[in-house]
Amino acid sequence: MTLLVTNIKELLQVREQNILKVSGSEMKELPTIKNAWLLIENDKIADFGTMKNMPKITADQTIDATGKIVLPTWCDSHTHIVYAGNREQEFADRINGLSYEEIANRGGGILNSVKTLQDTSEEEVYEQSAKRLKEVMKLGTGAVEIKSGYGLTEKAELKMLRVIKKLRENYDLPVKSTFLGAHAIPKEYKNDPDAYMDLVINEILPKVAKEGLAEYIDIFCEKGYFSIKDTHRLLSAAKEHGLKPKIHVNQFNSIGGVKVGVEHEALSVDHLEVMNDEDIEVLKGTRTMPVALPSCSLFLSIPYTPARKILDAELPLALATDFNPGSTPSGNMNLVVSLACIKMKMTPEEAINAATINGAYAMDLSETHGSITKGKMANFMITKEIPSFTFLPYAFGTNSIDSVYINGKLI
């Protein structure tokens, strides 16, 4: 099956095969081809170029993209798409003045979702989660990471991870799985959090690894949740089981989470709303990808990740949604890209790089996804007729996506 897209107004994120991420000042550059064509063979990108120099090609299907822009699908490297129910009451509570911490102390927050998840069948959790996955795919997401973390018992955590596995089996986009048993301390362990860490490390983690249910390990390294000591313990144990770290750090406080992530060669450190100079220095020269989650900052009215500080230090940066029922009930990467420009002062070029090639890197996918590169998977989207790619983040409330292709097939 061959698909030819012609008369493309601008083809974005055109890269050579050896580019796996972009950092600092490199992120200001977004390689493009104007008045372009793109050839897909089966599920991969076969060739591309300018219309002026297009050879004679016989394709099974041809699409005229006059006035439209083509770019890789978004790579969302941090989500909690698998959950049950919603938490709209807490949304109202926050409007009425309660903080994230106060809601958690009243039995809301993560523990609210935990109870709902535990009480919901695996089949129902799958059905609810599949709807969300289909929704974000229609919005242009072509690769996604999904975490557990609303189970907090062996049975419920394994249930979540099996749902993630089923989503991966039933949908064509890459679905990466992360074990986040250390998301919050269950009520029954409130007075003995070390015992809960023992459960996660000694009981649940070995079963997750044995069943091959996760590629990554995560922990909410934050005051009131899990300490630096806890993080060291868990990441050390996970390494023995072959799970790479991708961890929550610096959402509300800088307590050394970035440093411990780097020490354990984390693939990514995520959130980073609170960053000091030491955190920036620790990341220099490492392979760890900083990941910002601006729609979480929007929803919770908390600071935004200091993107300019990160990029001016010549570090890379990825963008993701943090899609979850409590702090970001949205998986819209288009909004994330807009917020990065509006609230984090990233240029459109920087934001698109962060949401494509760098997002792919933060999931170990940039060799196969995240750019228009010969031989990569044909995960791309075609916009509606728009004046330029800057219109994507500029028109923040408009759905400018016309069609989305995963593995060369229209979804």
Curated annotation (Swiss-Prot):
Gene3D superfamilies in UniProt: Metal-dependent hydrolases, Urease, subunit C, domain 1
Main subcellular location of this protein, as a coarse class: cytoplasm
EC number, as in UniProt: 3.5.2.7
The entry's keywords: Cytoplasm, Histidine metabolism, Hydrolase, Iron, Metal-binding, Zinc
CDD domains per the UniProt record, alphabetical: Imidazolone-5PH
Binding site for 4-imidazolone-5-propanoate: 87, 150, 183, 251, 327
Pathway assigned in UniProt: Amino-acid degradation; L-histidine degradation into L-glutamate; N-formimidoyl-L-glutamate from L-histidine: step 3/3
Record note on cofactor: Binds 1 zinc or iron ion per subunit.
Binding site for Zn(2+): 78, 80, 248, 322
Compartment annotation: Cytoplasm
Residues where N-formimidoyl-L-glutamate binds: 150, 324, 326
One Gene Ontology biological process: L-histidine catabolic process to glutamate and formamide
Gene Ontology molecular function terms on file: imidazolonepropionase activity; iron ion binding; zinc ion binding
Known catalytic reactions: 4-imidazolone-5-propanoate + H2O = N-formimidoyl-L-glutamate
Residues engaged in binding Fe(3+): 78, 80, 248, 322
Record-linked InterPro entries: Amidohydro-rel (IPR006680), HutI (IPR005920), Metal-dep_hydrolase_composite (IPR011059), Metal_Hydrolase (IPR032466)
GO cellular component: cytoplasm
Cofactor section: Zn(2+); Fe(3+)
Pfam families linked to this entry: Amidohydro_1 (PF01979)
Similarity-based family: Belongs to the metallo-dependent hydrolases superfamily. HutI family.
Function: Catalyzes the hydrolytic cleavage of the carbon-nitrogen bond in imidazolone-5-propanoate to yield N-formimidoyl-L-glutamate. It is the third step in the universal histidine degradation pathway.
The protein's name in its UniProt record: Imidazolonepropionase
